[in-house]
Amino acid sequence: FYVETKNNQLNFLQHMMLMLKTGGRAAVVLPDNVLFEAGAGETIRKRLLQDFNLHTILRLPTGIFYAQGVKANVLFFSKGQPTKEIWFYDYRTDIKHTLATNKLERHHLDDFVSCYNNRIETYDSENNPQGRWRKYSVDEIIARDKTSLDITWIRQGGEVDERSLAELMADIKNKSQTISTAVAE
């Protein structure tokens, strides 16, 4: 393995990476923590971007597995070329499936399959902020904290937050000061 860890999901991903032959392709279902976990997770993600073409991540909705609340993704990658860009399809935000009444069926993924095959971005911050298909360059991913692949842009209920990280931090600081002042009174 690339790195020792007791995390079974990370070990499974490492196993898949090592077993794949040059030119081989894989689609692996993994929980969210693989996308953002620090330490071994970050090391494995960097290796995945460097030695493989991680070209697509499909964010799955909750309710499709027997264990309730499981958040999972499908990582699509091939061995041989480094990653240049990653396409994300958010099939989680505002999507509800259950095993009993609204099962995930093939036709629910028709839009994803079309986007996957055509590689035309549907997200546009001005004209279509709810677009579920969006790409990021590998440089944008590497610049993220811990090389996190846990990316969302569609807000629950259709709200899109376009603020920068600096604006968000300033807002949090301002609200924190307001709360501190209120508590002190």
Model regions and ranges:
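A conserved structural/catalytic subdomain of Rossmann-like adenosyl-cofactor enzymes
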Residues: F1-E185
